[in-house]
């Protein structure tokens, strides 16, 4: 068995799920200013899980932002000076990616279609809400 952790913010550093190491935890903590309430709680949870369950039980992190990694620069850049992006990582990252990925794949299965053939809009409604245009099982801006 393993312990799975959904991490809200992976910034541009995490493009896939990862087996947790101390370096991974440190990086999640480093990027916490992008999602301070969530990522700092994730760090506490990761450290606690490692302490309680030990090295015999692997911990895996899944990032909500991974699904949105295919977003092109024209979609994720804001109309602010580029230096703000470089210095403070100010950009659009996308939200609720694990939910949007699941819903888009489930919709394709329900329709009996290859996800690569579909264009759809998925909605995540919960404590937070988001809408994402999906094409070929990846994020695409509605205007593309």
PLM regions: where:
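Short beta-strand-loop/turn "lid" adjacent to the catalytic site in phosphate-handling enzymes
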Residues: 1-38, 58-60, 66-75
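Alpha-helix boundary/interfacial micro-motifs
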Residues: 18, 23, 40, 81-83, ...
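Non-transmembrane, aqueous-exposed alpha-helical and coiled segments at domain scale
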Residues: 53-56, 61, 120, 130
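Glycine-rich phosphate-binding loop of actin/hexokinase-like ATP-binding domains
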Residues: 69-144
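Conserved nucleotide-sugar donor-interacting segment of glycosyltransferase catalytic cores
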Residues: 40-59
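A gly/proline- and charged-residue-enriched helix-loop-helix capping module
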Residues: 27-45, 88-91, 97-101
């Amino acid at each position: 068995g393993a312990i799975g952790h959904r991490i809200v913010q992976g910034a541009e550093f995490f493009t896939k799920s990862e087996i947790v190491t101390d370096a991974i935890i440190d990086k999640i903590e480093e990027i916490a200013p992008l999602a301070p309430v969530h990522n700092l709680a994730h760090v506490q949870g990761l450290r606690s899980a490692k302490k309680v369950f030990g090295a015999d039980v692997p911990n895996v992190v899944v990032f909500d932002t991974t699904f949105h990694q295919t977003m092109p620069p024209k979609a994720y850049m804001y109309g602010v000076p580029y230096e703000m992006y470089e210095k403070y990582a100010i950009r659009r990252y996308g939200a609720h990616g694990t939910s949007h990925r699941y819903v888009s794949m489930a919709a394709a299965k329900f329709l009996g279609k290859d996800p690569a053939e579909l264009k759809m809009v998925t909605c995540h409604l919960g404590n937070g809400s988001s809408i994402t245009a999906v094409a070929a099982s990846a994020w695409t801006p509605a205007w593309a």
